[in-house]
């Protein structure tokens, strides 16, 4: 079977489950180019990694607790399925993982509790780090637009703790191999359509 990426990520999983059409456009055809919001989020992550930065980034840093690891790049395997993910923040001593989100609209508890990305990261932590996170956090950073449409951080932030049960983690671990199989089969069919339409 053909896979657009040699691994499964949280974003792939979410996109495929939401819309196969969007998955094909994004990962098979490469038609997703991002937007100013995703680009701004990437910029914030990059700025937080620098030893020195702007005043607003320093304000943000003070709002986020200390973590032993930042931008932890994980590549692991679950029942033959290669999994990849970037966990923004990890505190190994306290068993904590966290993700940074930027948006104009405030991140809610409900959204945090239903975000499958966090469950996926719990799976990665179990497989790669060897432990199940005791706590999961979302660090939300508020953004706004100036008169020219440029995004900036307001300095307002919010930290949300969200829990994941063993059942939620185990259910996703059971689902991942099934979704991986479905992705391969769906991509094979889509490629056949593309090839037949070009003949």
Where is each model-derived feature located?
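Non-catalytic protein-protein interaction segments used by genome-maintenance enzymes to assemble
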Residues: 75-118, 123
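Short acidic (Asp/Glu) and glycine-rich catalytic loops that position anionic groups and cofactors
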Residues: 21-28, 98-102, 152-158
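Metal-dependent nuclease catalytic regions and adjoining charged, substrate-binding loops involved
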Residues: 7-8, 79, 126-199
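Residue-level signal for well-ordered alpha-helical scaffold segments within enzymatic catalytic domains
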Residues: 26, 46, 96, 120-127
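Hydrophobic/aromatic-lined pockets within catalytic cores
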Residues: 29, 52, 102, 126-130, ...
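Short, solvent-exposed loop/turn segments at secondary-structure junctions
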Residues: 30, 103-105, 142-145
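Metal-dependent nuclease catalytic cores that hydrolyze phosphodiester bonds in DNA/RNA
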Residues: 1-92
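Conserved aromatic-histidine-acidic binding/catalytic patches
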Residues: 32, 36, 108-113, 164
């Amino acid at each position: 079977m053909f896979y657009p990426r040699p691994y499964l990520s949280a974003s792939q999983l979410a996109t495929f489950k939401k819309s196969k059409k969007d998955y094909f456009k994004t990962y098979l055809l490469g038609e997703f180019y991002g937007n100013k919001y995703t680009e701004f989020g990437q910029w914030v992550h990059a700025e937080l990694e620098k030893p020195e930065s702007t005043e607003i980034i320093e304000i943000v840093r003070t709002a986020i607790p200390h973590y032993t690891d930042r931008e932890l790049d994980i590549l692991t395997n679950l029942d033959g399925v290669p999994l990849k993910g970037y966990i923004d923040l990890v505190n190994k001593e306290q068993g904590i993982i966290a993700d940074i989100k930027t948006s104009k609209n405030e991140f809610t508890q409900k959204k945090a509790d239903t975000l499958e990305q966090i469950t996926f990261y719990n799976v990665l932590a179990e497989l790669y780090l060897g432990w199940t996170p005791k706590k999961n956090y979302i660090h939300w950073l508020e953004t706004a637009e100036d008169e020219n449409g440029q995004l900036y951080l307001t300095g307002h932030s919010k930290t949300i703790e969200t829990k994941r049960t063993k059942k939620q983690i185990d259910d996703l671990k059971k689902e991942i191999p099934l979704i991986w199989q479905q992705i391969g089969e769906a991509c094979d069919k889509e490629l056949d359509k593309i090839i037949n339409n070009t003949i």
